Amino acid sequence: MYIVQARPITVLPPEWTLPEKDVIYTKGSLAEHLPNPVTPLFATLGLEIVNRASALLWIDMFGKSAKKLLPENGAYTIINGYVYLSANSKPLLIAVKSLSPRSLRRALTNSVARWETARKEFEDVIKQWEEKPMHMLNAHQIMEGIQTVFYGACIYFTRIQFTLPAASISETLFTKFFQGAARRAGITDTSVLLLGFDTIALQSEKNLWDLSEWAKQNNTLGFYLKSNPATKIAEDFKSSILPAEVSQDVWIEWKSRINAYFKEFGCTAYEFDFAYATPQEILTPTFESIKAFLEEKGENPYLRQIAFEKRRKQAENEILQQIGGHRKKLFLKLLHWAQNTAPMRENAIYLMGMGHPLIRRMLQEISERLLTGGAISHLDDIYWLTKTDWKRS
């Protein structure tokens, strides 16, 4: 027997006081893409824009009921630094039950085309501000650009809320109706029927594979990449000094190819709070992937896709042999619906942070000016300012 003295309690955990009564709070929708405590700038500037865009979505979904649904703080609120989706509890139950057939039908039809339209509109907003010479804009104009692009990101998110349900519902219906036929065909997991499509994420991986194959053809570059950790490669990439192991021509071409990769596939974000660096800034994971391919530790994405496509088509034929007549027509209809919408869902989420690299470049420009003027001590201090502090600076 051991006698152990308990340590005295010196600090009590913070009390989670709810901002409003009779309000439901959940980590759903956009709050899922904000898993960490948000910075003061996002809490006071970003969340205001998020709520403005979300209010339009709620009006679109619930019509006149939206006003009763929305809490005083808006659809999203902060509790102890974390963002939560919120709604007035009693009106929510009534509103969900009274969702119009029109709203449901719109969410389930033409989802891919509507996502492509939302994507194009968001891309146009980004392009408009990317073309502006940032060094010639004053602070007020840059601030306007940050808010415009982020509002575009929020509107894009609200638009895809009317497209993503088609992917999940089509997969659910397909599985429910044909799980028995799949089992009889020896297929235990129907998700095999939705794999192997050329999503943006897969295209990105194939591009990295191509970069590794090109590097193999340049012995000195290949040796350099294998011999150095990804952190060192990232440092050298950002440096103006040429690595001793690689010729200038090869290094210039290497940097050009990497920059082209980031231009095509780096327009995304790890988190929706714009205080977090994007893949274009954190180079290490990209170089780790290339190193894995070079060292033959990573699977060839081209071969993997071919294997998935082969297995998918084989599974389709095996299930078709188990059914006939009207069930076969229904199977093909639901299958094609699920196969059209599943890649769209992945691509839509991938592009949520499409504007974040530009937003962070604009914030960097303002931060450098504040640093030069002595308003802040470090570049990242800008994210710890509130909206009021920011305007005052």
Positions of PLM-derived features:
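Feature captures the catalytic cores and cofactor-binding loops of soluble hydro-lyases/lyases
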Residues: 1
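Contiguous hydrophobic, helix-prone segments at protein termini
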Residues: 5-393
